[in-house]
């Protein structure tokens, strides 16, 4: 299975709206609005975590256009875990609850590869088309 994840956050009428989506090349698996004020980074983390949880027991390739979510999972999360999710000054890191949830969710699928894809690309590739559908659905969900 291949899942494309996306999060969206923007200001409309003075209020920050947010949503996320999980899609395959053919269908929308989930598209949800998120609480007002949710940042784009948090929306992306939530989408990636939900994709992992949805893939419990399956083999899955997950694509994200978020460097923040991708690098959180691949490079930063284990370091933050070792530091008990604290910054160098001892303050809790941003989004620590969702990052902890992400670190648990990574073990849900039987096999998983999480890959970064370029956002807003129109090169006709499967990754570009999946990302475009995810982006559209995440923006709709935010409204």
Where are these regions (language model features)?
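Short hydrophobic beta-strand that contains or immediately precedes a catalytic carboxylate
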Residues: 3-5
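Short, intrinsically disordered/low-complexity patches at protein termini
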Residues: 36, 54, 137-138
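An amphipathic alpha-helix/helix-turn recognition signal
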Residues: 38, 42, 46, 129, ...
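A short, polar/acidic, helix/strand-boundary loop motif
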Residues: 24-44
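Acidic, His- and aromatic-enriched active-site or binding-groove loops in soluble protein domains
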Residues: 135-143
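Short glycine-rich loop/turn motifs
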Residues: 16-22
